Amino acid sequence: SGPGFMGVR
């Protein structure tokens, strides 16, 4: 749910 790994966070 954010700018993390592929947007998975």
From Swiss-Prot:
Keywords associated with the record: Amidation, Neuropeptide, Secreted
Keyword Coiled coil: no
Gene Ontology CC annotations of this record: extracellular region
Cell location: Secreted
Primary residence: secreted
Function: Myoactive peptide. Increases the amplitude and frequency of spontaneous contractions and tonus of hindgut muscle.
Biological process terms in GO annotation: neuropeptide signaling pathway
Arginine amide PTM sites in chain numbering: 9
Leader peptide range in chain numbering: none
Keyword Secreted listed: yes
Protein name from the UniProt record: Tachykinin-related peptide 1
